[in-house]
Design a protein with these regions (language model features):
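Canonical Rossmann dinucleotide-binding motif of NAD(H)/NADP(H)-dependent dehydrogenases/reductases
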Residues: 3-36
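Substrate-binding pocket helix/loop in short-chain dehydrogenase/reductase
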Residues: 61, 109-110, 117-119
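The beta1-alpha1 cofactor-binding region of Rossmann-like NAD(H)/NADP(H)-dependent oxidoreductases
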Residues: 72-86, 115
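Active-site loop immediately N-terminal to the catalytic Tyr-X3-Lys motif
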Residues: 111, 158-165
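Active-site helix of classical SDR
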Residues: 133, 169, 177
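Alpha-helical segment proximal to the catalytic Tyr-Lys
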Residues: 138, 182
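Residue(s) in the substrate-gating loop at a strand-loop-helix junction
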Residues: 153
Length: 182
C-alpha cells in the first residue's frame, strides 16, 4: 500500500479487533490513514461482547504514531451503522473509505439450520455491509469521492458444506458490490 493513496484519509474498518480486519487497520494507519477501528468484541460464533479488542488495536496504532479511535457499534443494525460513520465524522471530520470486514459464523447442515442462525449471518455479512455502505454513501456523493471494500469469499461462488447462510451472504455481497459500483 503506497502512502499517497491513504495519507490523511479517514477509513472505517469493521471487524477490526482481530484477524484480517486488525491487519488492515494497522496497515492503513501505517500508511497514514486515520482509522475507526470497529469491533463489538464477540467471537466468530457471536459469543460475548467486549470493547477490549477494538481498543487494543487503537492502542497499537497510536503506539506506532498513527491516529485511530475505537467504536463498538454493531453493523447488524442500520442505526448503529450510522453511528459508526458518525464516529468517523466526529473524530476526524470526514469519511473516505469503509472496509466491510465484520463477520460471524453459524455453521450447520442446511436441513438443521435454524432461522435465527440464517438471519444472524446475513445480518452481519450482507445487511451489515449494506447498512455501512448506505450510511457512508451520501457523504461520499457530497465530497465526490469514497471507497467501499467488501470482503467476500469463494464460498459465495462455489458454496461450502455447512455454510449455506455464509455462502448466500457472500454471493449477495458480490452483487451488492457490482451494483453500487455502477
Amino acid at each position: 500500500m503506497t502512502q499517497k493513496m491513504v495519507q490523511d484519509k479517514v477509513v472505517v474498518v469493521t471487524g477490526a479487533g482481530g484477524g484480517i480486519g486488525r491487519d488492515m487497520a494497522l496497515a492503513l494507519a501505517a500508511a497514514g490513514a486515520k482509522v475507526v477501528v470497529n469491533d463489538i468484541g464477540t467471537s466468530t460464533s457471536g459469543e460475548g461482547q467486549d470493547a477490549g479488542p477494538a481498543q487494543k488495536v487503537v492502542e497499537e496504532i497510536k503506539a506506532a504514531g498513527g491516529q485511530a479511535v475505537a467504536n463498538t457499534d454493531s453493523v447488524a443494525e442500520a442505526v448503529a451503522a450510522g453511528r459508526i460513520v458518525q464516529c468517523a465524522l466526529d473524530s476526524f471530520g470526514r469519511i473516505d473509505g469503509v472496509v466491510n470486514n465484520a463477520g460471524i459464523l453459524r455453521d450447520r447442515f442446511f436441513h438443521k439450520m435454524s432461522l435465527d442462525e440464517w438471519d444472524a449471518v446475513l445480518k452481519v455479512h450482507l445487511y451489515g455491509s449494506y447498512y455501512m455502505s448506505r450510511a457512508a454513501a451520501n457523504h461520499f456523493k457530497e465530497q465526490e469521492s469514497g471507497t467501499f471494500v467488501h470482503m467476500t469469499s469463494t464460498s459465495g461462488l462455489i458454496g461450502n458444506f455447512g455454510q449455506a447462510n455464509y455462502s448466500a451472504a457472500k454471493l449477495g455481497l458480490v452483487a451488492l458490490s457490482k451494483s453500487i459500483a455502477l
